[in-house]
């Protein structure tokens, strides 16, 4: 079995399971779209244990930096500036912070940080997101995105392992023939 075929089976089945879990038993507590972003990020970071670590740490760092950026942007500190200018300055500083954080090897995946940052801001801007970025609950978009992305990264890791097993089963069957 080719790698693409094994991945198609693994990701297809696990993607359906993840969607069912997120929309069913987990009752919409987490964001399936953020989980799929992290799942893709896992592969973007090269997979395996190192890709899992880079994805979880990078997306979490990006989410935290986004939360800080959102808090500062809405704190009224830049009230003398036009709102769009103040928000732009805050986002610029947040992005610069992410890139500088990438100097620390554990947080070197700038794309993972950007995915976490963007997902957190997107969730915070959704009209149905009532939470504050300082709450320690699932109403906080930072918390929701970090948890969703951890689950997504784990699904990525499992999908890679399952694809490897499917390829191995195919090779063992060919060896017996």
Predicted regions and their residues:
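Intrinsically disordered, low-complexity non-transmembrane regions of multi-pass membrane transporters
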Residues: 1, 163-177
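N-terminal membrane topogenic signal
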Residues: 1-9
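Transmembrane alpha-helical segments of multi-pass membrane transport proteins and ion-pumping complexes
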Residues: 11-24, 59, 63-75, 91-103, ...
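Pore- and pathway-forming membrane helices of multi-pass small-molecule/ion transporters and channels
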Residues: 12, 16, 27-46, 92-96, ...
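Structural signature of hydrophobic alpha-helical transmembrane segments
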Residues: 20-35, 78-92
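Alpha-helical membrane segments and adjacent membrane-interface helices in multi-pass membrane proteins
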Residues: 32-73
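Cytoplasmic-side transmembrane-helix entry/capping segments in multi-pass membrane proteins
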Residues: 52-61, 84-87, 107-116
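Membrane-interface helix termini and inter-helical loops of multi-pass transporters
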Residues: 74-81, 128-139
């Amino acid at each position: 079995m080719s790698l693409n075929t094994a991945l198609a089976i693994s990701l297809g089945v696990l993607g359906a399971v993840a969607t069912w879990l997120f929309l069913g038993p987990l009752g919409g507590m987490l964001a399936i779209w953020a989980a799929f972003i992290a799942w893709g990020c896992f592969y973007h970071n090269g997979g395996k244990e190192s890709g899992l670590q880079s994805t979880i740490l990078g997306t979490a760092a990006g989410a935290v930096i986004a939360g800080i950026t959102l808090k500062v942007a809405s704190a009224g500190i830049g009230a003398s500036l036009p709102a769009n200018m103040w928000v732009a300055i805050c986002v610029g500083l947040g992005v610069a912070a992410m890139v500088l954080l990438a100097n620390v090897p554990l947080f070197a995946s700038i794309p993972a940080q950007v995915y976490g940052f963007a997902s957190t801001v997107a969730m915070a801007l959704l009209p149905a997101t009532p939470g504050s970025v300082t709450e320690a609950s699932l109403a906080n978009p930072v918390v929701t995105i970090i948890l969703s992305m951890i689950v997504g990264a784990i699904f990525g890791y499992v999908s890679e392992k399952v694809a490897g097993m499917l390829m191995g089963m195919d090779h063992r069957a060919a060896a017996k023939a």
